[in-house]
Amino acid sequence: MFFCKATKGYTRTTVAEIVKEADVSISTFQNVFRTKDGVLVELVKFMFGSQFDMAGQIAGQKLPPVYVYAVETSIQLALTELNENLRDIYLEAYSHTEASEYIYQHTSSELYRIFGPYLPSYTESDFYELEIGSAGMMRGYMSRPCDKYFTLEKKLARFLSMSLNAYAVPAAEQKQVLDFIAKLDIRAIAVQVMQELFKALAMRFSFPLPDSVKA
């Protein structure tokens, strides 16, 4: 059922399709998830619960935590450029009341850990308020597909510059972070993350993978 949403998109996936793919009854589905929105919330919890871990593996342990943030947000933006169905899911996640609240709560804890040294007087509650703004920026950039004028590279640099400014990262350090991201093959990384995500979802929620994802 989760693969159906990830490969077809949120708005085009019906409850009937989810139930059929999951091979469960309507009553069982309603007891577990209540509605299609319940599936979205569970999907968001799973995806956002592991995104920082994936980014940490790519950035490595030797780099400051701000690099993990830059990699994680860059992967999100790259994923939405590679797969329109993932764009649909991410946009819905950042708009849906319960799903977006989970994102704010989960991400604000990470932001407090990462950017607390830059804003020592800020509490985790302050970072929650900042996350509402940065999540709005993320959704805005996700909703605008890249083209030959507004490339993915420009999108990443613009988003990171705005968000790192909001979190009081010094200009010299910002440049180092942006240079690091520019040297990554972020598209290839996003493809790898997408494949690993689908495989992890298959293991977590017990659905078969098509050959295109197994490869």
Residue ranges and their predicted role:
Residues 3-7, 50, 54, 79, ...:
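Solvent-exposed, amphipathic alpha-helical segments
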Residues 143, 147-215:
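C-terminal peripheral helix-coil segments that are non-catalytic and often amphipathic
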Residues 15, 43-52:
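Short, basic, alpha-helical segments at the C-terminal edge of helix-turn-helix-like DNA-binding modules
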Residues 92-146, 150, 154-161:
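Amphipathic alpha-helical packing segments from all-alpha helical-bundle domains
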Residues 42, 53-88, 94-96, 104-109:
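Hydrophobic alpha-helical connector segments
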Residues 87-92, 172-176:
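Short, hydrophobic secondary-structure boundary micro-motifs
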Residues 4, 8-38, 42:
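Helix-turn-helix
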Residues 9-10, 52, 56-60, 88, ...:
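Short, flexible helix-adjacent loops and helix caps
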